[in-house]
Amino acid sequence: MNPNQKIITIGSVSLTIATACFLMQIAILATTVTLHFKQNECSIPANNQVVPCEPIVIERNITEIVYLNNTTIEKEICPEVVEYRNWSKPQCQITGFAPFSKDNSIRLSAGGDIWVTREPYVSCDPSKCYQFALGQGTTLDNKHSNGTIHDRIPHRTLLMNELGVPFHLGTKQVCIAWSSSSCHDGKAWLHVCVTGDDRNATASFIYDGMLVDSIGSWSQNILRTQESECVCINGTCTVVMTDGSASGRADTRILFIREGKIVHISPLSGSAQHIEECSCYPRYPNVRCVCRDNWKGSNRPVIDINMADYSIDSSYVCSGLVGDTPRNDDSSSSSNCRDPNNERGNPGVKGWAFDNGNDVWMGRTISKDSRSGYETFRVIGGWATANSKSQTNRQVIVDNNNWSGYSGIFSVESKSCINRCFYVELIRGRPQETRVWWTSNSIVVFCGTSGTYGTGSWPDGANINFMPI
């Protein structure tokens, strides 16, 4: 082979190799582009349909990295669809309540910077529970804590922490409020925050961290709300608000809110005479509330809220073992399901109850005269039969030698049912303990259980003599 032929042969082989490399690069590029655009589709194995990801709201991006012949391909995995809560599962069948959480805020205040609070409550998003309370704009070991027995000052704010985390100095102040309610619709938190002058207060509606709507006082007499969670079904949340006398006729209205915007307001109707501080729970497709009659009755009023047509009905818990404080002795207390019992109706305390078929589960102070001790039990026929008094499944939560306070309900959705939980406010300081100048609280939380359980007492536990004055 002469030199020219060698040159031609080498050139041909080189050209062939170059062409092959070029074609391989094109194939790799085509594969990369195909896999890159494939991330915009989610295949559903059940019926082999392909659903675009574009309309799905993505809360967070999850990146999966796959290595193919030194080529890095980033593939975005389609997240789950974020949906409104509808609470359509049945209510869990329970045998009683088991301990869940306790924050020990007062004991910790003896040696740490913990907020002065009252009116606590608990509410949960779809994955986690949070505790709320109305702060007094001060920590306990602070001269500003003097006089915090007062309910309404412009420095009060709504505090929010993960359940079990005391309200330390790093706690988020959600809004300005001396009365509040909060709930999660499945997508974001709604906070109802009341503040301002007694005769001209404002309720702000904060959704997903933004102020969306507001409403002013309609009776010019301390606009106020639940001091526990509101309830959202299919994106519409409902909250009960009252404006008017605390010991006489008042104007109660039920507000319906969608993504922070008031969409409807219904007046109270039915036989309830006075409504304060409702404890509400989902009863799909509607909402039910058990409240405080601060005027005529020690039996608790009930509000049934129709979420479809905004209609309202009200009555009273049928149980003759009544839930408010003060109240008559159990042997002489009564309820006819429809009217206030006119037995020591004033002043009262926030509380809760919920229906279980014809029965009722309820909690109340052990003392019939003061906010001390706390017990729960089920009353057979207590939701359907007037003056029923057959009690079962009684539990002591706080013994009668220790102070309690407000209590309220919150609901938690499990895989198969809706569980009911409750919290108890454990008030310390004034007016009962005059050695100190402050008033504050801790909380204890229990949830329904279908299992067995023991006994105990879970008071606040702080030695008042160890506390800052």
UniProtKB/Swiss-Prot annotation:
Q: Which GO terms describe its cellular component?
A: host cell plasma membrane; membrane; virion membrane
Keyword field contains Transferase: no
Disulfide bond residue pairs: 92-417, 124-129, 183-230, 232-237, 278-291, 280-289, 318-337, 421-447
This protein's UniProt keywords: Calcium, Disulfide bond, Glycoprotein, Glycosidase, Host cell membrane, Host membrane, Hydrolase, Membrane, Metal-binding, Signal-anchor, Transmembrane, Transmembrane helix, Virion
Q: After translation, how is this protein modified?
A: N-glycosylated.
Using the UniProt annotation, give the residues that carry a glycan (glycosylation sites): 61, 69-70, 86, 146, 200, 234, 402
Q: What is known of its domains?
A: Intact N-terminus is essential for virion morphogenesis. Possesses two apical sorting signals, one in the ectodomain, which is likely to be a glycan, and the other in the transmembrane domain. The transmembrane domain also plays a role in lipid raft association.
Give the free-text miscellaneous remark of the entry. Answer: The influenza A genome consist of 8 RNA segments. Genetic variation of hemagglutinin and/or neuraminidase genes results in the emergence of new influenza strains. The mechanism of variation can be the result of point mutations or the result of genetic reassortment between segments of two different strains.
Q: What is this protein called?
A: Neuraminidase
Query: What species was this sequence derived from?
Result: Influenza A virus (strain A/Turkey/Minnesota/833/1980 H4N2)
